[in-house]
Swiss-Prot record:
One of its GO terms (molecular function) is small GTPase binding. Residues 8-121 form the NTF2 domain. PROSITE patterns: NTF2_DOMAIN. The gene is NTF2. One of its GO terms (biological process) is protein import into nucleus. Pfam families: NTF2. This is Nuclear transport factor 2. Keywords: Cytoplasm, Protein transport, Transport. It is found in: Cytoplasm. Facilitates protein transport into the nucleus. Could be part of a multicomponent system of cytosolic factors that assemble at the pore complex during nuclear import.
Length: 125
């Protein structure tokens, strides 16, 4: 494999969460019209709908702390699957919420875009 999918996953993850935590309205260029986001139970398609959902989330400040990051090649075409778990600190909360997120990244010229994005909060049973 010529591509280092682990390095790609690390770079993408750092960029995505830094951008999300500072100004999530700017995440639109990572998605395309065919992209899909499943956020908890909501499914949205297209960059515009996805960004509208992310911007509408009911918090002002957010910080993601990554606990695990796993990546695998997802097809012979260079697709990459990325799975992240971590903690989410919202506004002035002191107790983080656990989350999981999966990205399916598709090559697009010299970069990648998010084809699938699945986000889920992990509540203890």
């Amino acid at each position: 494999m010529s591509m280092d999918f682990n390095a790609l996953a690390q770079q993408f993850t750092e960029f995505y969460y830094n951008q999300f935590d500072s100004d999530r309205s700017q995440l639109g260029n990572l998605y395309r019209d065919e992209s899909m986001l499943t956020f908890e139970t909501s499914q949205l398609q297209g960059a515009k709908s996805i960004v509208e959902k992310l911007v509408s989330l009911p918090f002002q400040k957010v910080a993601h702390r990554i606990t695990t990051l796993d990546a695998q090649p997802a097809s012979p075409n260079g697709d990459v699957l990325v799975m992240i778990t971590g903690d989410l600190l919202i506004d002035d909360e002191q107790n983080p919420q656990r989350f999981s997120q999966v990205f399916h990244l598709i090559p697009d010229g010299n970069s990648y875009y998010v084809f699938n994005d699945i986000f889920r909060l992990n509540y203890s049973a």
